């Protein structure tokens, strides 16, 4: 466990808090999140070590850092093997009216600089708010550390008057992405039902409601209108897998 023997300064206190969370997540077998906290906490301890001059405290810090590094390395090896075997599975349950589940909060753990290609299967990228959801998702993809160059979208076509809105909206998104050096390939299917997002680094995310899991904002000037972390959600389940050999649509 992370103990307060590291010292009482603010940097040490922050490191202890992060590492305490890492140990808790580790005990709950939430290894992916635990690894992130271990790595963050270790970096913080290394900064504390640099600013520590007393030899006895430096010795304590080195010992603790070594222990946390060993545990983090073991978790990383375990997760790598799970991914290699195709056994990795994490489930997140989003409760009714829950907040804090913006696309960035949900996906950032899996968006590394190795991500250059993304596949999205979602039958409901049709109505105006759904097009905005897709646009927000694309905005997230072109931010660092990602280096996305191609996005594949498979969705269902809107029949009737809504078809013009859907096609023109997607075309506008396509042109906008193009100005950022990103190609958007759009395909339609009348039989699509599954909702799935895949990255070419092997991560696969299945959301029960697809990208459309946010509730309608109470008004244009209400919290959550722009910041999706503050927007209440519909109840849904998110399943996360890792497949070394990601299939293309």
Swiss-Prot record:
Q: What are the TM regions of this chain, as residue ranges?
A: none
**GO biological process terms, semicolon-separated:** midbody abscission
Please provide one cellular component term from the Gene Ontology annotations of this protein. Answer: midbody
| Gene Ontology terms, MF aspect | identical protein binding; phosphatidylinositol binding; protein domain specific binding
Pfam families under this entry? MIT, MIT_C
Membrane topology is: Peripheral membrane protein
**Is Signal one of the keywords?**
no
Keywords, ordered alphabetically: Cell cycle, Cell division, Endosome, Membrane, Transport
Please describe the quaternary structure of this protein: Homodimer. Interacts (via MIT domain) with CHMP1A, CHMP1B, CHMP2A and IST1.
Functionally, this protein is described as follows: Required for efficient abscission at the end of cytokinesis, together with components of the ESCRT-III complex.
Domain commentary: The C-terminal domain interacts with lipid membranes containing acidic phosphoinositides and is required for location at the midbody.
State the name under which the record lists this protein: MIT domain-containing protein 1
List the source organism.
Answer: Mus musculus
Q: Source taxonomy lineage?
A: Eukaryota, Metazoa, Chordata, Craniata, Vertebrata
């Amino acid at each position: 466990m992370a103990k307060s023997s590291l010292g009482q300064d603010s940097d040490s206190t922050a490191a202890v808090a992060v590492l305490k969370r890492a140990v808790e997540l580790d005990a709950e077998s939430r290894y992916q999140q635990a690894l992130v906290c271990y790595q963050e906490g270790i970096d913080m301890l290394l900064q504390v070590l640099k600013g520590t001059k007393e030899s006895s405290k430096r010795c304590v810090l080195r010992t603790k850092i070594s222990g946390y590094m060993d545990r983090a390395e073991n978790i990383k090896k375990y997760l790598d093997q799970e991914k290699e075997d195709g056994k990795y599975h994490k489930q997140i349950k989003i409760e009714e009216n829950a907040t804090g589940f913006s696309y960035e909060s949900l996906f950032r753990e899996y968006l590394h600089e190795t991500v250059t290609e993304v596949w999205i299967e979602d039958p409901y990228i049709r109505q105006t708010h759904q097009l905005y959801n897709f646009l927000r998702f694309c905005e997230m993809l072109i931010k660092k550390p990602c280096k996305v160059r191609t996005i594949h979208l498979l969705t269902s076509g809107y029949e009737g008057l809504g078809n013009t809105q859907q096609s023109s909206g997607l075309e506008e998104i396509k042109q906008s992405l193009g100005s950022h050096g990103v190609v958007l390939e759009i395909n339609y299917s009348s039989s699509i039902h599954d909702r799935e997002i895949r990255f070419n680094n092997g991560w696969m995310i299945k959301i029960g409601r697809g990208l459309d899991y946010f509730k309608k904002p109470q008004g244009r000037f209400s919290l959550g209108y722009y910041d999706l972390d503050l927007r209440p959600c519909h109840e849904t389940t998110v399943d996360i897998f890792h497949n070394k050999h990601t299939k293309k649509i």
